[in-house]
Amino acid sequence: MLVMPAIDLREGRCVRLYQGRIEAETVYSTDPVAVARGWVERGARWLHVVDLDGAFAGRPRNLEVIAAIIRAAGVPVQVGGGIRSLESLAGVLAAGASRVVLGTVAITNPEVVATAVERYGERVVVGIDSLDGQVAIEGWEATVARGAVEFARQMASLGVTRAVFTDIGRDGTLQGPNIAATREMARSGGLKIIASGGIASLDDLRKLKELAAEGVEGAILGRSLYNGNFTLEEALAVAADGD
């Protein structure tokens, strides 16, 4: 199973939010490039970077920092946040991203996703952000009357192969991931799933790893790493156990 440390960017800093709320922000570092280097030195093989300013603004806002992270990291970097046009997507790829996560635009303009997949193939990932089973968009400030699994199936029909699945109610809470919802998404959505939100312990990682045969291929770790619940080395050992 793939373990991806998260670097969430706001105003050029490395932060974490609680359930996606700006007013519930914790600043972990003013030097996200150093943070990226640190995760790679500890064994990270991928990084997951989110442009929070971009998610709220509707267009990437931290491209210079993202490009610097990618140059410094030397490992593949998956980038999301505010990428709502083909132009923005191309800009993030030009900055060096290995994969790009499309969220809001996949709901509001799925034709963009279809074109992106035609051009870039598996470098295009969809972000499925779920609140009580419904899809959330625009930096999680709004929900739409679409079931998350139904949405995943639509994305699979467009040629998407992979999704980052976040249960917003668990994000940043350290309450454990929503295993039932993640299992349902992996079984029924037709996409490979990278799980995100609420992972608090090595046992949580083990539970997600048990879903590998059903399509859960990775986990994104944020607050649990930054708060020291466990080390990245420990997480990588759990992820590799039995592989």
Swiss-Prot record:
The first-level EC class reads isomerase
Q: Which reaction does it catalyse?
A: 1-(5-phospho-beta-D-ribosyl)-5-[(5-phospho-beta-D-ribosylamino)methylideneamino]imidazole-4-carboxamide = 5-[(5-phospho-1-deoxy-D-ribulos-1-ylimino)methylamino]-1-(5-phospho-beta-D-ribosyl)imidazole-4-carboxamide
Q: Sorted alphabetically, which SUPFAM superfamilies does this protein's record hold?
A: Ribulose-phoshate binding barrel
Q: What subcellular locations does the record give?
A: Cytoplasm
- Keyword Nucleotide-binding recorded: no
**Principal cellular location given in the protein's record:** cytoplasm
Q: What is its EC number?
A: 5.3.1.16
Biological process (GO) annotations?
L-histidine biosynthetic process; L-tryptophan biosynthetic process
User: GO CC: one term?
Assistant: cytoplasm
Pathway(s) this gene product operates in, as recorded in its UniProt entry: Amino-acid biosynthesis; L-histidine biosynthesis; L-histidine from 5-phospho-alpha-D-ribose 1-diphosphate: step 4/9
UniProt entry tagged with the keyword Amino-acid biosynthesis: yes
**Protein family:** Belongs to the HisA/HisF family.
- According to UniProt, the name of this protein is 1-(5-phosphoribosyl)-5-[(5-phosphoribosylamino)methylideneamino] imidazole-4-carboxamide isomerase
What is the protein's species of origin?
Moorella thermoacetica (strain ATCC 39073 / JCM 9320)
Q: Which gene encodes it?
A: hisA
